[in-house]
Design a protein with these regions (language model features):
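Asp-based, Mg2+/Mn2+-dependent phosphohydrolase catalytic module
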Residues: 1-4, 113-114, 118-206
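Active-site neighborhood of HAD-like aspartate-dependent phosphohydrolases
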Residues: 2-42, 178-179
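Generic structural signal for small/hydrophobic residues in well-ordered secondary structure
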Residues: 10-13, 53, 98, 108, ...
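Alpha-helical elements of Rossmann-like donor-binding domains used by nucleotide-donor carbohydrate transfer enzymes
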Residues: 23, 27, 45, 59, ...
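Short, surface-exposed acidic
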Residues: 32-43, 69-80, 201-206
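A metal-dependent, Asp-based hydrolase signature
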Residues: 48-78
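Short, acidic loop-to-helix structural element flanking the phosphoryl-transfer center
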Residues: 66, 75-107, 118, 146, ...
Length: 206
């Protein structure tokens, strides 16, 4: 078995809450008294471009929410979106301990829109943990498409067999495995620690 050199981490559902998922959108509908079917239909049409960084947050909101007059301001809705992001303290603590060992290259590999991604990087000090951010909004590619994994491997110059992808969604992991990457489906920190150890990743002190 090839020795592990690089850990790729999903963000939402692993170290943080999801940035703008179905639960967040349902809460927005409830909070701002929106029509779910209309909003969700517009969201689905804009999602690919939004997460690939092809449109800005303001345009996404103009197309999905503010295509007509509302009783609330754009800034109020933006603030709601950003406030939805919250940390998983145990995950961040474990991530920090691994990063401080400096035994492995650590990188984010996530789907996220530009403004929410950069808010999360800044708010939760993710530069302290990750050396690189292979985010959909920067690469203009999304998981589970094979190209985003291939691009990350080429940029890092890593062999798939020496990399582990940690993600909470099985489909994302399936596609990575097809390229030869090792994978762990995240459920909790204790389970992650055990599975990393099985791959030979040193987690001493964690």
């Amino acid at each position: 078995m090839a020795e592990v050199s690089t850990l790729f981490w999903d963000n939402g559902g692993v170290i943080l809450t999801n940035g703008w998922d179905r639960d967040a959108r349902k809460k927005a509908v409830e909070t701002f008294h929106l029509d779910w079917a209309d909003f969700e239909d517009r969201h689905e049409l804009m999602l690919d471009a939004f997460e690939k960084g092809e449109i800005a947050l303001d345009e996404y909101l103009r197309r999905t929410i503010f295509y007509r007059e509302r009783a609330f301001a754009v800034e109020e809705f933006r603030e709601f979106m950003f406030d939805w992001s919250q940390p998983f303290p145990e995950s961040l603590d474990f991530l920090g301990r691994l990063a401080r060992q400096r035994k492995y290259a650590m990188a984010a590999l996530n789907n996220e829109s530009l403004e929410i991604n950069e808010y999360r990087i800044q708010k939760f000090h993710l530069r302290d943990y990750f050396e690189a951010f292979f985010s959909s909004c920067y690469l203009r590619l999304r998981k589970p498409g094979a190209e985003i994994y291939t691009k990350a491997l080429k940029i890092t110059q890593c062999e798939p067999s020496e990399c582990i992808l940690i993600d909470d969604r099985e489909l994302n992991l399936e596609c990575a495995r097809e390229l030869g990457m090792k994978t762990i489906q995240f459920k909790n920190v204790a389970q992650l620690r055990d599975e990393l150890k099985r791959f030979g990743v040193a987690t001493d002190g964690n």
